């Protein structure tokens, strides 16, 4: 039963689905390779990449995330609790390039709610693909991905997800997205208030 359902879903996919997926994967891989190469070529800096790397590394080793460069706790600067799920990854992958790979994947994931929103509003697979291309080619998205590492990068897919969920009346998903948005940074509460007008 589950296999038949999966086969039917795969058959329902079109060239537009495949194109959007391929472009998203290509963009994500390109961004991950480009940013890790820049990092290992000494193209990143202590602000802000080093702050997050040291803080997460300390948490992964059971220590308080006191960042020496700032002279205070990592979460004393911004309440970016969205970083906590990265701690177990530091147990497995010790490379500093991990943060750039995660950031590229997170930014790429935003293509999915963009696709779903466009398809829901326009009912057109080609236009949904165009929306994904517009998302991936947006200069702010690529700049965010290439300008060191920032937890704010998680806002791109989370905001897109929250907007989709609100427009689709999926309130459980909406609430989940809003909670995750609030975990990115303390000042996102202002955005969430505005987002409430949609919801």
Task: Walk through the language-model features, giving the residues of each.
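Transmembrane-helix signature of polytopic, membrane-embedded enzymes
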Residues: 105-137, 156-157, 172-176
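Loop-to-helix entry region of an early transmembrane alpha helix in multi-pass inner-membrane enzymes
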Residues: 22, 84, 92-112, 129-132
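Short acidic/glycine- and proline-prone juxtamembrane loop motifs at membrane-interface regions
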Residues: 144-152
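Extracytosolic helix-loop segments that constitute the early lumenal/periplasmic catalytic or substrate-binding loops
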Residues: 48-74, 81-82
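Membrane-interface transmembrane helices that cradle and orient dolichyl/undecaprenyl
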Residues: 154, 160-173
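Transmembrane signal-anchor helices characteristic of membrane glycosylation enzymes that use polyprenol
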Residues: 16-46
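Perimembrane helix-loop-helix junctions
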Residues: 2-6, 10, 191-199
């Amino acid at each position: 039963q589950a296999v038949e359902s999966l086969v039917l879903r795969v058959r329902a996919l079109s060239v537009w689905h495949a194109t959007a997926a391929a472009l998203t994967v290509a963009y994500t891989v390109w961004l991950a390779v480009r940013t890790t190469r820049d990092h290992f070529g000494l193209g990143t800096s202590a602000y802000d990449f080093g702050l997050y790397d040291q803080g997460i590394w300390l948490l992964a080793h059971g220590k308080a995330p006191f960042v020496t460069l700032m002279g205070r706790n990592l979460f004393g600067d911004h309440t970016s609790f969205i970083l906590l799920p990265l701690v177990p990854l530091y147990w497995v992958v010790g490379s500093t390039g991990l943060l750039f790979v995660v950031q590229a994947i997170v930014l790429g994931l935003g293509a999915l709610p963009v696709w779903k929103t466009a398809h829901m509003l326009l009912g057109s697979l080609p236009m949904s693909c165009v929306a994904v291309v517009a998302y991936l080619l947006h200069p702010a998205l690529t700049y965010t991905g290439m300008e060191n590492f920032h937890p704010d990068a998680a806002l791109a897919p989370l905001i897109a997800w929250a907007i989709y969920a609100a427009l689709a009346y999926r309130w459980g998903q909406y609430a989940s997205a809003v909670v995750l948005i609030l975990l990115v940074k303390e000042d996102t509460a202002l955005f969430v208030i505005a987002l409430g007008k949609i919801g």
